[in-house]
Amino acid sequence: MNPNISFGWNGTNVDDDVIVHTGRCILHNVTLNGVTTVGDIAIYNGTDATGTLIATINARTAVAVSFQGMTFNYDCEMSTGIFVSFTDFAGNITVTWA
């Protein structure tokens, strides 16, 4: 097995509001890794929360906490960038993009 193989996707670990990428790209996946406090995760095509809302992951119930390790597939073209915003959410996600 060759450890130097490139798979083409970048992974960014997110635990707060952040610009994941600036510029044109593809939003591939969002993986919910862990939840400390339930809330919402918003994904925008842009560099801040004024961009176009692409997705809202609602993790507001006790049942949602059991989603840890769940991956949401988008494969969505982003013209401006990827911005992630947490509302009442404390936890950890991974955004995969190219």
Predicted regions and their residues:
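Surface-exposed, low-hydrophobicity beta-strand/loop segments enriched in small/polar/acidic residues
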Residues: 1-98
